[in-house]
């Protein structure tokens, strides 16, 4: 598939099935772990580092699966799901630029949570700025990211790392 600068939910789910970039390319997780509904912008020269920018959105609805179990009587989106979305998007970037293999989160330097996503919210926006791409024996991207709920930043992460592996048997 030719690289696009935006992707619909159907296209993201095709990525989960290995149909968007091919069966041997990196994949996004399928529902319910896919943590965004669309990528509204992706490029390989934007962001504050000039190495790539991804913007994505998740529509918040009270019936989202995590509100029913986290927590009963006090529903809130788990912070780890927002962090995972940042890793998902960083990995998608690597697949989008043609890096071979399957993506795996390798860590992050710093994470801050300064708010929460409640069922009354309407929109989560992710902004991922690629700070480094290594494309040698090790294929890895490093990024800085933030997550906004209804326009207010509530999560920030620095030095997110995702690697691509042609074999994950010994990972």
UniProtKB/Swiss-Prot annotation:
Q: What is its EC number?
A: 4.2.1.59, 5.3.3.14
Q: Give the annotated active site.
A: 70
Q: Does the keyword Phosphoprotein apply?
A: no
Q: What InterPro entries does the annotation carry? A: FabA (IPR010083), FabA_FabZ (IPR013114), HotDog_dom_sf (IPR029069)
Reaction(s) catalysed by this chain, per the record, are: a (3R)-hydroxyacyl-[ACP] = a (2E)-enoyl-[ACP] + H2O; (3R)-hydroxydecanoyl-[ACP] = (2E)-decenoyl-[ACP] + H2O; (2E)-decenoyl-[ACP] = (3Z)-decenoyl-[ACP]
Q: Where found?
A: Cytoplasm
Q: Which HAMAP family match?
A: FabA
What PANTHER family does this protein's entry cite? Answer: 3-HYDROXYACYL-[ACYL-CARRIER-PROTEIN] DEHYDRATASE, 3-HYDROXYDECANOYL-[ACYL-CARRIER-PROTEIN] DEHYDRATASE
Report quaternary structure and partners.
Homodimer.
Q: What is this protein called?
A: 3-hydroxydecanoyl-[acyl-carrier-protein] dehydratase
Coding gene?
A: fabA
